[in-house]
């Protein structure tokens, strides 16, 4: 499943 938010954005 994809991450709800990206830390390394």
Swiss-Prot record:
Example of a GO biological process term: neuropeptide signaling pathway
Disulfide bonds: none
Residues modified to Leucine amide: 9
Main location as per UniProt: secreted
GO cellular component, one term: extracellular region
Subcellular location: Secreted
Coiled-coil intervals: none
Highest taxon in the source lineage: Eukaryota
UniProt keyword list: Amidation, Neuropeptide, Secreted
Similarity comment text for this entry: Belongs to the allatostatin family.
Function description: May act as a neurotransmitter or neuromodulator.
Listed name of the protein: Carcinustatin-10
Organism this protein belongs to: Carcinus maenas (Common shore crab)
């Amino acid at each position: 499943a994809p991450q709800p938010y990206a830390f390394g954005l």
